[in-house]
Amino acid sequence: MIIDSHEHVILPAESQLEKLKRASVDKAILFYTTPHPEKAKSYGEWKEEMAKLFRILAGENTEKSNSERIHRGNQELLRSIRAFPEHFTGFGGVPLGLSLTETGSWIEEEILRNGLRGIGEYTPGSEEQIRQLETVFQAL
């Protein structure tokens, strides 16, 4: 069995599955994502999708908007996994900046209850975000 150990969700899931088949990959470990450059129909739309990533890395989002964004990303991830469980498994997102109790609850509700295999990925864009990883590690 050939497993791709790191892919981000591509929409629609059927498109991602087709890419796996063309590459003779049996299964992929998926990670949630916010930008979806594959949906862009023009260079301008592609730039808009990538701007989302740059705002995240710059820490320009509120704690509430980050939690909402990651929850939506986890839901997309779960839809892909549930549509093709023989081909996809996944790691879910956990927001930074929550308290230890909130982080533990998030992991229980969003990750464990949904059968996800782990958490990730993190791309901290500031020293503050790097320090906030400690809470996630403690909650595990």
Show where each model-derived region lies.
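Active-site gating/metal-coordination segments in enzymes
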Residues: 53-140
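An N-terminally biased module of ancient metal coordination in phosphate/nucleic-acid-related enzymes
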Residues: 1-72
